[in-house]
Amino acid sequence: MANVGLQFQASAGDSDPQSRPLLLLGQLHHLHRVPWSHVRGKLQPRVTEELWQAALSTLNPNPTDSCPLYLNYATVAALPCRVSRHNSPSAAHFITRLVRTCLPPGAHRCIVMVCEQPEVFASACALARAFPLFTHRSGASRRLEKKTVTVEFFLVGQDNGPVEVSTLQCLANATDGVRLAARIVDTPCNEMNTDTFLEEINKVGKELGIIPTIIRDEELKTRGFGGIYGVGKAALHPPALAVLSHTPDGATQTIAWVGKGIVYDTGGLSIKGKTTMPGMKRDCGGAAAVLGAFRAAIKQGFKDNLHAVFCLAENSVGPNATRPDDIHLLYSGKTVEINNTDAEGRLVLADGVSYACKDLGADIILDMATLTGAQGIATGKYHAAVLTNSAEWEAACVKAGRKCGDLVHPLVYCPELHFSEFTSAVADMKNSVADRDNSPSSCAGLFIASHIGFDWPGVWVHLDIAAPVHAGERATGFGVALLLALFGRASEDPLLNLVSPLGCEVDVEEGDLGRDSKRRRLV
């Protein structure tokens, strides 16, 4: 899959499926609305209209189903007819699975995605997850032939006209962002260390005409970034705080996306075991998603100030490693007693959000991280967990997740009950909870929030993506689509405007909004 290029076209054109294999994909009632005249040129002379209709009649999705149309060259596949209220109407997760299992092999292939216009964005991002970019398989390295998958959307429903050119460009940039994030997360730390991650940031900056701000190694210590420095100081490749900033004329508010970029997490001196350490190359998933989303957002036009803050470190073991009982002074000015070196993500993010607040003057701060294993217990493998000081933004995250396919579900926000878990006798707080049975994912997020203050008047959103950042052994690029959708109102792109949760449409009780002091407008 690493040598596969995705091409989004308004019309994929006609071709014999034996020369260009084909997958037709959609919900069954949508597939029945596709006229034979539209697919005939992609199936003939191998498939007749009678065979096409017969194939549709055999489909019985539970939750999915597929039927070969011609040998191994053409297949039609059906998505679930209905989804529950906490799932995406696009059935995005099933799209990825069906593409992986049903798309015929070949150098040049075609996917016809049949859906309604509001599901185009989520469907495209789901398709992209089926084509990871990273591989080191020796056979793959010998196959230098570039493969292409052409994607055509056939729209049904009210807005059933052809897909516009601007939409195709948005889909290309969004899916490039998803695949970029997944590639970074899939790459092992012997290649994707902090130096390499900075190269990725510089590459995106050069493409966008932005020079990144980079603070690293001893300068972090000198300037007071005790969280990032303390976590990464034992590693061969030094830690860093990097920032990409987009500041257009006419901006009315400032947004900061803060990503956790732990390129590898051994656990530090509180070391992980042999079964829990493998896979910790994925601990940079938050920073990877922020990079992919920032690239796509700026390419599509972003009307407000947007800063991408990357907190990069390798949590390693060595003579200079942070010890339990050490006390670090963080950028917020607060002291933290370390009682668990494996609770390192919150330390680097605490510095990141403090920087966003103090130096960038952000009105809205969103941090994204593979923060806690408990997230998968709290909200499962498919739904990220959201913790925020705003009822409005909590509802917006859930709605944006359903629109883009990166699903989200709320955690309990109650600092007056939970923050006492971090009580320290010798510092302002400890970095790990006293009671792991007391909503640990919520508590971990509250640790981050405490470094901008629970009384901070702006909007703070924390997204824990520990479980959905991967599916099996592969990264998903989770978070890119979510950020683009959640902040779609600030985009100049019509498709991102469409998938954004509009402020007036977010389902929050009127009483909640009346009491909510964090009423920054939904962008």
Curated annotation (Swiss-Prot):
Q: What is its EC number?
A: 3.4.11.-
Which keywords, in A-to-Z order, does the entry hold?
Aminopeptidase, Hydrolase, Manganese, Metal-binding, Protease, Zinc
Where does tissue-level expression of this protein occur? Ubiquitously expressed.
Cellular component, GO annotation: cytoplasm; nucleus
**Cofactor section:** Zn(2+); Mn(2+)
Q: Where does Zn(2+) 2 bind?
A: K260, D265, D283, E344
From its record, what is one biological process in GO terms?
proteolysis
A GO MF term: peptidase activity
Residues where Zn(2+) 1 binds: D265, D342, E344
- Identify the catalytic residues: K272, R346
Write out the transmembrane intervals: none
Q: What class of enzyme is it?
A: hydrolase
In the record, the note on similarity to other proteins reads: Belongs to the peptidase M17 family.
Function statement: Probably catalyzes the removal of unsubstituted N-terminal amino acids from various peptides.
What is the protein name given in its UniProt record? Probable aminopeptidase NPEPL1
Which species does the entry assign this protein to?
A: Homo sapiens
